[in-house]
Amino acid sequence: MKSCSKCGQQAQDDVQICTQCGHKFDSRQALYRKSTDEDIQTNNIKMRKMVPWAIGFFILILIIILFFLLRNFNSPEAQTKILVNAIENNDKQKVATLLSTKDNKVDSEEAKVYINYIKDEVGLKQFVSDLKNTVHKLNKSKTSVASYIQTRSGQNILRVSKNGTRYIFFDNMSFTAPTKQPIVKPKEKTKYEFKSGGKKKTVIAEANKVTPIGNFIPGTYRIPAMKSTENGDFAGYLKFDFRQSNSETVDVTEDFEEANITVTLKGDTKLNDSSKKVTINDREMAFSSSKTYGPYPQNKDITISASGKAKDKTFTTQTKTIKASDLKYNTEITLNFDSEDIEDYVEKKEKEENSLKNKLIEFFAGYSLANNAAFNQSDFDFVSSYIKKGSSFYDDVKKRVSKGSLMMISSPQIIDAEKHGDKITATVRLINENGKQVDKEYELEQGSQDRLQLIKTSEK
């Protein structure tokens, strides 16, 4: 379409004269317009052909940009840089995330210890250099899949390994810290409570039994902890150092506010050693001068006493109280028996025992002669007066005499004797008919007018 320059009437391009005013149209203008339209159409065709190429080129640029972005964050070198930056900047949370595995959760405090251990035992500059070299060699190698970074003393501190690929192009590097098991060996059953892997943990260890408390990455640890024993509750620390271990375990040193008690007894020379006891906080234990008792909490008073026997009588010291303010890691205390009282009692009992032994010597001298006469004459009446009638021993000896199986005895010696009411227990050493020395234990009963009679006997 075109318009008349004189009246503005619209007309077709091929019309030569305006139907409104009769004005004659310029034919050159029509030809120019036609030529222009053809040029535009040609240019449009060219542009449509260029669009796919432009889109393809744009996509290629995007791919190249994306590749470099991925490379910056996912190449082995980039993965290495992330770990290095975290260690350099003491980013314990990032290090904990990088080192945590499905089987071993590393918390931020453990990561903090690990960072310090690397800086102390390897040196940051050396660690970075070793790590980059290790990653480079693994990345180039077709056969190697893992390698270790070590401390100056030769201990493994970081395992670097290939773990598949990232986005097809890049090796995925895995960084894992090797672990060891800290072990405790308490003297008595102990419960330990502490934080590990970001969670509260409880470990119960039996007395004198090696017990692991978990898995830890390299470091020098001082872990706040509580422990509980039969003696009480303690606050303190569990300490262990990977530098002090060349095995899969590391010994734990306990650092708690505790007191250990060493006891010295005085005035106890007349007491039977095996009878001596120490009672601490109402808990009775065997006494030993070389033994250390405890540990006990340093924030509570301790009560302590001792006891022992002499001639079957129990003697006790006064109970002492050790104030909490006086308790130290090693606390010594002396407990005193009334030695004069003990000696007087022992002297009295020894006189009684000597009197009893004399009676028994006389009794068994007569009994051995009567026993042998009964054997020789096959007559129970010789020995019957020495044995209580109605006792099982009475019937047994009578039966043996009748069967001729009664054994002859000689040279009786009183080894030991004790009296409890009207009953007497005596250990007698004899020589039997075979000439062998034997010890026999007899039980006797003391009747009216101090008459002694046998009730039973047994081999010692």
From Swiss-Prot:
Cytoplasmic topological domain: 1-49
Its membrane topology: Single-pass membrane protein
Protein name: Membrane-associated protein TcaA
Annotated organism of origin: Staphylococcus aureus (strain MW2)
Family: Belongs to the TcaA family.
Membrane-spanning segments: 50-70
Keywords, alphabetical: Antibiotic resistance, Cell membrane, Membrane, Metal-binding, Transmembrane, Transmembrane helix, Zinc, Zinc-finger
Disulfide-bond pairs as recorded: none
Localization, UniProt: Cell membrane
Record topological domains on the Extracellular side: 71-460
Coiled coil recorded as keyword: no
GO cellular component: plasma membrane
